Swiss-Prot record:
This is Orotidine 5'-phosphate decarboxylase. Pathway: Pyrimidine metabolism; UMP biosynthesis via de novo pathway; UMP from orotate: step 2/2. InterPro entries: Aldolase_TIM (IPR013785), OMPdecase (IPR014732), OMPdecase_AS (IPR018089), OMPdecase_bac (IPR047596), OMPdeCOase_dom (IPR001754), RibuloseP-bd_barrel (IPR011060). It comes from Gloeobacter violaceus (strain ATCC 29082 / PCC 7421). The gene is pyrF. GO terms for molecular function: orotidine-5'-phosphate decarboxylase activity.
Amino acid sequence: MGGAERVIVALDLADAQAARALVERAPAVRFWKVGLELFTAAGPGLIEWLKARGCRVFLDLKFHDIPNTVAGACRAATRLGVDLLTVHATGGQPMLMAAVSACTGEAARLGSPAPAVLAVTLLTSLDAQLLEQQLLVNVGVSGYVEHLAVLAVSSGVQGVVCSPLETALLRERCGNDFLIVTPGIRPGGSGEGDQRRTLTPGEAFARGADYLVVGRPVTTAPDPQVAFKAIVAEVGG
């Protein structure tokens, strides 16, 4: 898998029109992430449009609810043909297992590939101080992320979303067959934005990430196609 297939661009835009315009300006991008704002505004039709163009889709809605509700959402996402989807690891093992079972069961019924379920460990906007003071978790960032990743493995989840700073730890702890997707990626020379635990693309891959998620460095660039190709070149893709 080359570098272009491993760099996911976040379509963090307000509506379908803006999203489609960006996709058309950056045909080199093969994997797009659709999150809460855009999915709420544009609905499933945008996913279907992306799939019709031959794009891969990471549906990042971070499901977190009772197991039965999450299972229903995962079946619906599977019918859309998404490649990756997210659930919150803090939903607990019954919810995580229900998500995986729903995806595999619906895919088998349809005769199509099942999306990989990724457990979100700790949002990259949170750091140790916020974790301890506001969430009352006092095991530290690495300890908390490791605990949730191990929970995900034991629940049959195919991978995790985590900060690049925890990638090496989780690669060692969870093995080479476990998918690791890292947001909070900032190419050299770009700012951190609202994400506190960041690395460059090359650093994240070196620590064991399978996929990187990049947003504003591409989506707000004067030429998104050029910006994306520069990131791929940075990681030797």
